[in-house]
Amino acid sequence: MASNSWNASSSPGEAREDGPEGLDKGLDNDAEGVWSPDIEQSFQEALAIYPPCGRRKIILSDEGKMYGRNELIARYIKLRTGKTRTRKQVSSHIQVLARKKVREYQVGIKAMNLDQVSKDKALQSMASMSSAQIVSASVLQNKFSPPSPLPQAVFSTSSRFWSSPPLLGQQPGPSQDIKPFAQPAYPIQPPLPPTLSSYEPLAPLPSAAASVPVWQDRTIASSRLRLLEYSAFMEVQRDPDTYSKHLFVHIGQTNPAFSDPPLEAVDVRQIYDKFPEKKGGLKELYEKGPPNAFFLVKFWADLNSTIQEGPGAFYGVSSQYSSADSMTISVSTKVCSFGKQVVEKVETEYARLENGRFVYRIHRSPMCEYMINFIHKLKHLPEKYMMNSVLENFTILQVVTSRDSQETLLVIAFVFEVSTSEHGAQHHVYKLVKD
């Protein structure tokens, strides 16, 4: 299975993202420019649902129509509040908020006890972002909605972990949902992370006394490498500029704070039998270390695609990593059934310097035929409990190493169930330990 190189796409555009003119009409009886609390709340929700996409269009799978991001935000406000805001008003509001965020960030950076080089890098990073990116990055920390509750003691026993689906409304980890209009009006759902991998969300102001990065122990990150995004998807192209996309699983970029709790721990020995035990297996890798590089991700996969597949459907995987070091990484992905390796794909990726950090992207890597056939067969099972029974013995092990030194940088064990949520794919992350 050949390595798949990444080709850069156009970067996210500015806040103005034009679409059809259908919403540029009268403003009901609401004064133009007045953003009441209910409008502002709906605006913030929509920012979290629809990531910046430049001048590209988004297709709603249940309608098949193309929309610019700002028009989708305007539609969302109308549907939630009954009040009209045009896409141009949305664009203007985004720019006003972005200028405010820039001023706040500049004041905060200048007041910190940092050397001038660090201050300059932070300000340059901000300057390289569009208004839409700045506002969307900051909305991840908005205070409108508390985080959704996470299921507790999922791993209290091995059997409980493998057989118990989470309670409705408690599937952990937010994920992209492009069908917000079916949701109840209140309470609102937790904000959902952007899915585009072309920018890194604006980081919170770091603590001067911090000895480790804010993302370590709170995200999938070792001392050498951090996973920024991971997704497996099916895509159908409508024409050269538009496509419909369905996410089976997705880990979006996050913006952790030092106040966030560390990841829950799971004993790695609980899952040894789910992965190969021979040379290069999970047990041998963990004994080799380093221990802070090992993570478990439980996915609740979304198989409810409404997209017509057809012969031109593309099944792929994209992932993105970042590091303070420039190196060449090797990414091994092993698909396992009943603890035995079925197929393996090894890809090589090189560093790209972006905003003071080295970024590694594996973009639209084609799925192997085994995986595509597996998904097709799984979707045709009549009941979800049957799907989960099959998935109980299906796992994926991803191992990222330095190609030159062979050092283990990151190991992620993926396990799966089928999502029962109307909000699409969900996930929860654990760190693997050995007490």
Curated annotation (Swiss-Prot):
UniProt xrefs under InterPro entries: TEA/ATTS_dom (IPR000818), TEA/ATTS_sf (IPR038096), TEC1_TEAD_TF (IPR050937), TEF-5 (IPR027253), TEF_metazoa (IPR016361), YBD (IPR041086)
Compositionally biased spans, kind Polar residues: 1-12
One term under GO cellular component: chromatin
Record Pfam families: TEA, YBD
The entry's DNA-binding region: 28-104
Region ranges (Disordered): 1-34
Region (Transcriptional activation): 173-435
Subunit structure: Interacts with YAP1 and WWTR1/TAZ.
Role, per record: Transcription factor which plays a key role in the Hippo signaling pathway, a pathway involved in organ size control and tumor suppression by restricting proliferation and promoting apoptosis. The core of this pathway is composed of a kinase cascade wherein MST1/MST2, in complex with its regulatory protein SAV1, phosphorylates and activates LATS1/2 in complex with its regulatory protein MOB1, which in turn phosphorylates and inactivates YAP1 oncoprotein and WWTR1/TAZ.
Protein name: Transcriptional enhancer factor TEF-5
